[in-house]
Amino acid sequence: MNEKELKEMIAGILTEMVADNQAVSTATVTAEEKPVTTHVTETTEIEEGLIPDITEVDLRKQLLLKNAVDPEALLKMKAFSPARLGVGRAGTRYMTSSTLRFRADHAAAQDAVFSDVSEDLVKEMNFISTKTICNSKDEYLTRPDYGRQFDEENSEIIRKNTTPKAKIQMVVGDGLSSAAIEANIKEVLPAIKQGLNMYNLDFDNVVFVKYCRVPAMDKIGEITDADVVCLLVGERPGLVTAESMSAYIAYKPTVGMPEARRTVISNIHKGGTPAVEAGAYIAEIIKKMLDKKKSGIDLKEAE
């Protein structure tokens, strides 16, 4: 059913409702009252427009408790957390607005997981496009081990398009949130480059990995023999945000190394650590790793 047919159906239903009401009424409709029926019919036309996006509303500034004892104190408390605090109830049920927002945020999280990073973005950023041995998103989700491995073809693409034994190798992976990459990568990469330039450091070609798990950076480290590998990857989305990105950084990563050798900077998004601020901090961490020749817990202990 198209939009025109839907409008005609609604108009017909409303017209029948008006006719039924007139039949039940015992009052005689006079000539002066006839325009009322015309008026009702005219208002049945559906207006064109866009429904506001409820996900754009800042939950920290939204007051849903109509009879709050101290509204100002409630808003002050909500300002410190994006959690759903003071959502209000209608009897034993959530308010309609709270329920719709919950469903919208859940849908956004699902979209972030099951969608792919735009190929146009990969081309625009001049990334070296590669993929792990996963053949589909379903396989990526059900076989995490496949998201850590590259076939010979993609290994060769990485080998030919990166600088051997570079000080820094940057990697971007879709991870569990393509939305996180699309929302943050254009800001965080220039910030990292600018921060590194202050230490007379830089990086060359950036590798993009489709169907990427964090340990994929270990294989890239072995292929390139880079001193430091930094992976920017989409975090598992939740109801607070679907655009959160993390940076996993390691000194001389190798396949099968302990997770404790990674340094992680998480919660990179507009509602957490801003991308520009995170970029500057990532550059600082990379410089420390190159100086100390350590990462993860070892770097922490060496500071």
From Swiss-Prot:
This is Ethanolamine ammonia-lyase small subunit. InterPro entries: EutC, EutC_C, EutC_N. The gene is eutC. It comes from Enterococcus faecalis (strain ATCC 700802 / V583). Pathway: Amine and polyamine degradation; ethanolamine degradation. Pfam families: EutC (PF05985). It catalyses: ethanolamine = acetaldehyde + NH4(+). Binds between the large and small subunits. Its main location: other. Adenosylcob(III)alamin binds at residues 214, 235. Keywords: Bacterial microcompartment, Cobalamin, Cobalt, Lyase. It comes from the Bacteria. Catalyzes the deamination of various vicinal amino-alcohols to oxo compounds. Allows this organism to utilize ethanolamine as the sole source of nitrogen and carbon in the presence of external vitamin B12. The basic unit is a heterodimer which dimerizes to form tetramers. The heterotetramers trimerize; 6 large subunits form a core ring with 6 small subunits projecting outwards.
